[in-house]
Amino acid sequence: AGLSIEDTPRLKLKWAFISLLVVIIIVGNVFIPCDFNFWRKGRIPGEKLLYYREDVAATVVVREYPQGGQLNRVMEVDGTDVAGTDYMLRSTQKFQGHLPLLIHKDPKKVLIVGFGSGGTTWAVSQHNVKRIDVVELVPSVVEAAAKYFTGVNYGVMDDRRVNIKIGDGRNFVLTTQEKYDVILTESIHPIYAGNGNLYSREYFKLCKEKLAEKGIMSVWIPLWALPEQYFKMIIETFRQVFPYSTLWYVPNCLNRQVYLIGSKNELKIDFKSLQTQMSMKKIGKDLEEIGMNNSF
């Protein structure tokens, strides 16, 4: 029997499907790595898993990967990058440590909520402070930082002024009897589960109560993966608690970010004085590495 006219469209569809399948196989052979350990080792060729630990609070991972002719490291907490050695992550870690202390001018006691790689704590330690309290929820974060990120934190955990406490940051602020010149929150993205508490009115009010008379609070806000309405909500919530507040935009890397600085009393910012402090030897060198050593 011959081929009927009705069978022709079906035959064409069949050959089209076969052709598409052949193309998929060819592309797969070209672009998928031959080393199938790739899927176990990491997400890009050459990547290594350096650290993996499951805590009650979270799972912590440290990965090392090649980029731009060098090896970078990144720390993940429950699958989210929280700290690392690449330019963008170092920039965030350094600047969020320096900015509030430069604005305060003479801080002596600082509280940092979150430790990450320790880069922010190290930046704070470059200033003439007497005490740095750090609260980190996940014990393995501190362990991983001490082992794999000494090039970022420079062993700041051994600084006699640094006191690292394992626990919930909000609960620590609630129960502590200390008063701080500066309270700052590490780069904790507000969209991820559990992080919203550190951007709430209740948390801001708790921090305000634990500030010294001339104390200031600093809050990091990412501009990526954050819906505009959430961004506006955070700013408005912060301003309700801190009527004297300023917003600082950081344009030095692709991942845009801002910092909210709030105080109990009116805060007058002297940019000439700020520039003088930013030019100081240790601080100036650190800020120059991220292109942020000029206040103008």
Walk through the language-model features, giving the residues of each.
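C-terminal structured "cap/appendage" subdomains that terminate the fold
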Residues: A1-L3, G116-S117
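Soluble small-group transferase modules, centered on the S-adenosyl donor enzyme superfamily
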Residues: L3-H104, K109-L111, R160, D168-R170, ...
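The AdoMet/dcAdoMet-binding core of the Class I SAM-like
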Residues: T85-V241, L247, C253-L254
